[in-house]
């Protein structure tokens, strides 16, 4: 039976993974995961609901674990039967960056740049330039005085508060005096 002939009830009863197998067999070509899901939504007359979301999550899990399917890159899925073993290894093999092994002569080479060294050198240069600018700055710069005056920072000493603090201190000393001292 073709997938287009499925009724809503049949779509509800059949698993998405089996429907995906049928769909891919009919199409005969790889399909994007989202296109497969859109096809299922149209067949089942689904609207966005929690039941559909749960089925999609289960479908994606099954798609990754079911040995009949193969991810051929960029979220495109096909049937494993379509590919030879060599093709499968080529499509799913991770890409490995090859690096040359350094020998003692290479390590001593001043012109050789190792990975990440350029970034460190740029950071070091920027730091050195910033330090040089700070060293060149005049400490008696009138512009600094203007900036301080314009910053609206006001520091005032409140003499009343100081007097109250002193009074509290003196009162505490009176409490700490030994009563026997007054009798002497």
UniProtKB/Swiss-Prot annotation:
Coiled coil: none
Annotated segments matching region Disordered: 114-184
Alphabetized UniProt keyword annotations: DNA-directed RNA polymerase, Nucleotidyltransferase, Transcription, Transferase
TM region(s), chain numbering: none
Keyword Nucleotidyltransferase: yes
Composition-biased stretches (Acidic residues): 117-184
Keyword field contains NAD: no
Disulphide-bridged cysteine pairs: none
GO MF term list: DNA-directed RNA polymerase activity
Pfam families tied to this protein: HARE-HTH
GO CC aspect terms: DNA-directed RNA polymerase complex
HTH HARE-type domain boundaries: 14-82
UniProt-listed InterPro entries: Asxl_HARE-HTH (IPR007759), RNAP_delta_N_dom_sf (IPR038087), RpoE (IPR029757)
GO terms of biological process kind: DNA-templated transcription; regulation of DNA-templated transcription
Subunit structure: RNAP is composed of a core of 2 alpha, a beta and a beta' subunits. The core is associated with a delta subunit and one of several sigma factors.
Family classification: Belongs to the RpoE family.
Role: Participates in both the initiation and recycling phases of transcription. In the presence of the delta subunit, RNAP displays an increased specificity of transcription, a decreased affinity for nucleic acids, and an increased efficiency of RNA synthesis because of enhanced recycling.
Name listed for the protein in its UniProt record: Probable DNA-directed RNA polymerase subunit delta
Gene source species: Staphylococcus carnosus (strain TM300)
Gene behind the chain: rpoE
